[in-house]
């Protein structure tokens, strides 16, 4: 498995990027899911956002566990960078699907 300069391997990074793109493309279904739990939060959008990020993060951790890899600080920081680099896409997708 080829490793990028720090953190997440190239293969795992590609997998996570593709997974995140999938969830962005499915934002409408997460908005619908959030409608079911709207009574627990003032913002259904925040619920949908949290579900997307939480699901991708859970998959990130499970991928490492399946490969018997230790999650290191560099890996977590790179994961957070991946999410930060896609915040606008996630937000835009959630906003588009609520109109």
Predicted regions and their residues:
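Amphipathic alpha-helical binding modules
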Residues: 69-99
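Charged, amphipathic alpha-helical oligomerization/scaffolding segments
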Residues: 22, 55, 82-85
